[in-house]
């Protein structure tokens, strides 16, 4: 019965079309084969019966609720009677004429498409052919002469066997992808508990430091220097948790379609730093659990991969170890080794161990021991991660004594890492902004050798681009090609506020002192040094995670002349927090929930800038912007910055066509938000 239900659910999206095709097709083809191209035998009552059966499929959504449970079985009856049964019956009654041989072949193709489970389809075929033979025997006076052409039988068998074989293979692949997607979806939901738990703890700490108004309201409250320092540290940690959570979602979602881990964000990391961070940031159920983990670094090493993914591998191993602890004297020992051939991280615990029959299956997809709470991405995901790094993970265990997981990483100079970097480099995009021929020639030669995608633009061409057209992995800007006055630099920097690329300023004598604060901090590279070692420098800029510069503190916006900003967003929390952030900078803030409220508020208030969400109920941001721009009122020219979480080309086209002035992608840190606002008011 479960197979019958699955067949019906699979076909359901197309059933209305199938129903109309059968309802209209059966009587129409009676006219075709009876009058236009007469055949030896036709049967109008039988065709009307099939047409009525298909009408039941059209009418299925209007049937009484208590009858709908029988719809899957009804669908099987209809397909059996109206496809193999009807067409084989007509084939027999027409003495295997060519018209009905071709018609029966068409019915086979349609049958395979409508019934995707092979066993059900073959049962229907045998039942249908059996009924057709019986009815033909009865119709011919309990006598049936088989004048069949046996040369047609191999063709029918070929269609049935290979049609089902190919269709079954595609169906298995489709179901595997769906299962993987479900597994990753459930895993993401579970694994996000770690950063959410961290945020919850951060909020608890903040609330414990802040004065409680219920204990007595005051006009002013005083915080000690220690409390202020603690709040700063906690908020900084919370921002790191949010960044890590966003990166994790992005990394895991890219793995769903391909059943493998995406390598697009791989960089060189210190294994010791990542492991230490994983130990400190793991969500322990008990405070004493932290002391159960020890780290022994016998030799440090770097690896090419994702620090976030390695942390989640460590989280999984810790979680499984704690879940299978067997005594109060439980401990987890992490050891790091390194030699000239390979690097290893070994995680050993003295828990309940793993049985030999289970040990063979723990890295297989969708495997679970069945113990409550044993969910998440699990060990199969750990295997995928380690293989994406060019390494592997294996397990040894003794039941009741210990378990040991050994993660092996290739060395940075190994052929495996070089191959991964070579494949990744082909997918990298680099923008080079320069008007010096020697530099352009050099980077062009390197691009051919390293095989990355290179775009070379002069300054006027850069200034013609939109912000969203700077989606590169690396942007190299020759400062000597920009004018000395700084006007070009300001314009270029304003265009780069949206990009996630690593931005490099190349200088010949000394870095230029910049008075203007921007939302990014560039990396300064001496041009001569870059020319002497171009390939190594580009390789380091693309893959060295430690090649970073500290972020600059946010520069307060100039609010001497108090300006008014309208924040339009249906997300109450985001709207309120954005308003608080702007009010701290000295702005007047008006909050509205949708585009219609925003237009009504504009009729009553003078607004200098609108920060507008896109997806909102009642009236979305795009439509609201069109109405604002189309009005003949004073606010028609007010700057509108789209505040959206969707940066797809379709959304950006909508933003541009609506008359919005600019856009910023959620989540945006305050530096980027302030810099964007400063460009317009």
From Swiss-Prot:
Keywords: ATP-binding, Cell membrane, Hydrolase, Kinase, Membrane, Nucleotide-binding, Phosphoprotein, Protein phosphatase, Transferase, Transmembrane, Transmembrane helix. It comes from the Bacteria. The keyword Membrane applies. The keyword Transmembrane applies. It holds the Pfam family Response_reg. It is found in: Cell membrane. It catalyses: ATP + protein L-histidine = ADP + protein N-phospho-L-histidine. SMART domains: HATPase_c, REC. CDD domains: HisKA, REC_hyHK_CKI1_RcsC-like. GO terms for cellular component: plasma membrane. Its EC number is 2.7.13.3, 3.1.3.-. The chain crosses the membrane at residues 17-37, 73-93, 112-132, 148-168. Residues 187-413 form the Histidine kinase domain. Senses the quorum-sensing autoinducer CAI-1 ((S)-3-hydroxytridecan-4-one) which probably functions as an intragenus signal. The sensory signal is then relayed to LuxU and LuxO. This is CAI-1 autoinducer sensor kinase/phosphatase CqsS. It comes from Vibrio campbellii (strain ATCC BAA-1116).
């Amino acid at each position: 019965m479960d197979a019958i239900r699955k067949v019906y659910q699979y076909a359901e999206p197309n059933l209305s079309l199938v129903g109309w095709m059968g309802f209209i097709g059966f009587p129409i083809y009676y006219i075709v084969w009876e009058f236009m191209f007469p055949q030896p035998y036709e049967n109008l009552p039988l065709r009307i019966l099939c047409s009525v059966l298909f009408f039941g499929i059209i009418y299925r959504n209007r049937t009484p609720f208590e009858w709908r449970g029988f719809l899957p079985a009804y669908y099987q009856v209809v397909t059996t009677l109206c496809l193999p049964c009807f067409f084989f019956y007509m084939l027999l009654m027409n003495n295997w004429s060519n018209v009905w041989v071709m018609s029966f072949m068409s019915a086979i193709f349609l049958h395979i498409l409508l019934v995707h489970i092979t066993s059900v389809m073959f049962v229907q075929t045998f039942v249908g052919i059996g009924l057709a033979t019986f009815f033909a025997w009865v119709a011919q006076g309990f006598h049936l002469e088989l004048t069949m052409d046996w040369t047609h039988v191999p063709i029918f068998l070929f269609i049935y066997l290979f049609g089902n074989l190919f269709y079954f293979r595609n169906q298995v692949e489709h179901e595997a992808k769906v299962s993987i997607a479900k597994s990753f979806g459930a895993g993401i939901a579970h694994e996000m508990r770690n950063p959410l738990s961290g945020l919850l703890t951060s909020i608890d700490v903040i609330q414990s430091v802040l004065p409680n108004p219920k204990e007595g309201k005051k006009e002013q409250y005083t915080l000690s220097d220690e409390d202020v320092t603690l709040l700063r540290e906690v908020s900084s940690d919370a921002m790191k948790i949010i960044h890590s959570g966003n990166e994790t979602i992005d990394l895991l979602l890219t793995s769903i379609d391909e059943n493998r881990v995406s390598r697009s964000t791989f960089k060189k990391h210190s294994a010791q730093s990542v492991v230490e961070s994983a130990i400190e940031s793991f969500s322990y159920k008990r405070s004493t659990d932290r002391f159960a983990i020890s780290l022994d670094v016998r030799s440090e090493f770097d690896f090419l991969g994702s620090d976030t993914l390695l942390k989640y591998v460590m989280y999984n191993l810790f979680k499984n170890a704690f879940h299978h602890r067997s005594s109060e004297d439980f401990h987890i020992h992490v050891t790091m080794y390194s030699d000239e051939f390979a690097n290893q991280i070994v995680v050993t615990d003295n828990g309940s161990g793993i049985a030999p029959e289970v040990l063979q299956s723990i890295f297989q997809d969708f495997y679970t021991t069945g113990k409550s709470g044993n969910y998440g991405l699990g060990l199969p995901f750990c295997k995928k991660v380690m293989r994406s790094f060019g390494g592997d993970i294996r397990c040894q265990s003794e039941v009741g004594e210990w378990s040991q997981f050994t993660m092996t990483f290739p060395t940075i100079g190994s052929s495996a890492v070089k191959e991964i970097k070579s494949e990744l480099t082909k997918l990298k995009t680099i923008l080079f902004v320069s008007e010096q021929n020697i530099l352009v020639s050099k980077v062009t030669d390197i691009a051919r050798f390293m095989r990355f995608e290179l775009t070379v633009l002069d300054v006027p061409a850069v200034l013609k681009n939109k912000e969203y057209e700077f989606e590169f992995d690396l942007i190299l800007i020759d400062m000597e090609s920009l004018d000395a006055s700084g006007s070009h630099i300001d314009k270029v920097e304003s265009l780069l506020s949206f990009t996630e690329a690593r931005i490099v300023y190349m200088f010949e004598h000394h870095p230029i002192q910049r008075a203007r604060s921007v939302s990014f901090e560039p990396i300064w590279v001496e041009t001569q040094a870059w020319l002497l070692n171009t390939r190594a420098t580009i390789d380091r800029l693309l893959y060295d995670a430690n090649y970073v510069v500290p972020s600059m503190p946010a520069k307060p916006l100039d609010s001497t002349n108090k300006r008014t900003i309208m924040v339009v967003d249906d997300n109450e929390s985001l709207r309120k927090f954005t308003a608080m952030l702007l009010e701290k900078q000295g702005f007047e803030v008006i909050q509205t929930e949708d585009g219609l409220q925003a237009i009504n508020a504009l009729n009553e208030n003078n607004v200098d800038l609108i920060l507008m969400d896109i997806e909102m109920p009642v009236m979305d941001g795009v439509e609201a912007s069109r109405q604002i721009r189309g009005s003949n009122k004073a606010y028609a020219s007010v700057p509108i910055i789209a505040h959206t979480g969707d940066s797809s080309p379709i959304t950006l086209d909508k933003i541009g066509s609506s008359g919005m002035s600019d856009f910023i992608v959620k989540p945006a840190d305050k530096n980027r938000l302030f810099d964007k606002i400063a460009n317009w008011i």
